[in-house]
């Protein structure tokens, strides 16, 4: 991958020319490409993706990485950036369309006042995030169908995935998280998370260094759920005491051993017999490359 200024998409023009930033940018693009490859997000057929742009650091990083891969001929997919303006008070409605137009990026801006619905349905003092997310997802599915897209692409990163795993573990009693690739309930659209291998800190450093017009995520006045905040604090503490712990825990999500857990739906314990090799239950899963 080259970094020559005359061979770069406008979304990356003006990038810092420091060695540190070049390494950061290459790491992000490499991690995104690995996720795309490892989880089969690009199948070789003509495809159109709806890339969801909230205006936060993560979605800007996602869009820039996908555009760079496409610009360099490594992502044979048509990209359509989409922002859903949900009617939150104070949302700067002109920021994203002006940015996308200036960058020459195909886009769709959709206004749907889901904020009023959420305020009406959620008791005062409760977080809006869950219902807001469901309403947003439904609208994004609709837009994807209207635009002839085969997938919607979201900006959840490694830390989001890890936090969701521990939220399910601590509060839901199950081993589950956000998968990097899934099919929606209707069965007609893929949902991709190409930032699955990218650390939140890398998204933060990248978007800030590029001076993208980041829009705060708390315009509605509701903070992210208390459970997620608590999990984030726990993970921050572990990382502070043992640097690199997040990456090790994330790698564990790619190295599951059903025969060493307790779910008979995943492993036939009742049918286990002597005379055969002990059940690693299949080949060693692939290991994460790259990382922090």
UniProtKB/Swiss-Prot annotation:
Belongs to the TtcA family. Homodimer. The thiolation reaction likely consists of two steps: a first activation step by ATP to form an adenylated intermediate of the target base of tRNA, and a second nucleophilic substitution step of the sulfur (S) atom supplied by the hydrosulfide attached to the Fe-S cluster. This is tRNA-cytidine(32) 2-sulfurtransferase. Binds 1 [4Fe-4S] cluster per subunit. The cluster is chelated by three Cys residues, the fourth Fe has a free coordination site that may bind a sulfur atom transferred from the persulfide of IscS. GO terms for cellular component: cytoplasm. It comes from Cereibacter sphaeroides (strain ATCC 17025 / ATH 2.4.3) (Rhodobacter sphaeroides). Its cofactor is Mg(2+); [4Fe-4S] cluster. It is found in: Cytoplasm. GO terms for molecular function: 4 iron, 4 sulfur cluster binding; ATP binding; magnesium ion binding; sulfurtransferase activity; tRNA binding. InterPro entries: Rossmann-like_a/b/a_fold, TilS/TtcA_N, tRNA_Cyd_32_2_STrfase, tRNA_thiolation_TtcA_Ctu1. [4Fe-4S] cluster binds at residues 129, 132, 220. Pathway: tRNA modification. It catalyses: cytidine(32) in tRNA + S-sulfanyl-L-cysteinyl-[cysteine desulfurase] + AH2 + ATP = 2-thiocytidine(32) in tRNA + L-cysteinyl-[cysteine desulfurase] + A + AMP + diphosphate + H(+). NCBIfam families: PRK10696.1. It comes from the Bacteria. A motif (PP-loop motif) lies at residues 54-59. Disulfide bonds: none annotated. Catalyzes the ATP-dependent 2-thiolation of cytidine in position 32 of tRNA, to form 2-thiocytidine (s(2)C32). The sulfur atoms are provided by the cysteine/cysteine desulfurase (IscS) system. The keyword tRNA-binding applies. Keywords: 4Fe-4S, ATP-binding, Cytoplasm, Iron, Iron-sulfur, Magnesium, Metal-binding, Nucleotide-binding, RNA-binding, Transferase, tRNA processing, tRNA-binding. Its main location: cytoplasm.
